[in-house]
């Protein structure tokens, strides 16, 4: 669902999406073709590479969405930044503080791997990251959705 907010200077489109653990978001499963992904998201598309040898990825800056692909063009992971809005099981998971996000992930997956600036739930296919670290007031800056085996 898109929520559109208009002002005099700029039109902002907020993506409000439901996470499907280990499978992307409702309506766009991991493994989808690049064409399907590009038709799912609207707005300005920028294609880039994370490294000189990586597979080209897509970025919709106005939506806060990145799409990463396998060599065959299948959707491998989705990454979200502001202004995207994500929920899981009816609970808002992005935007949210790291403290609340970690508490939520641990309730669902007791084996969450926690680092200084991130956490990974292989059981849910969700990774969260912040530049600030795990301070209580730090906000999740990116949320990555991935499938089984993404982190090895």
Predicted regions and their residues:
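Short helix/turn-capping signatures at newly exposed starts of structured segments
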Residues: 5-152
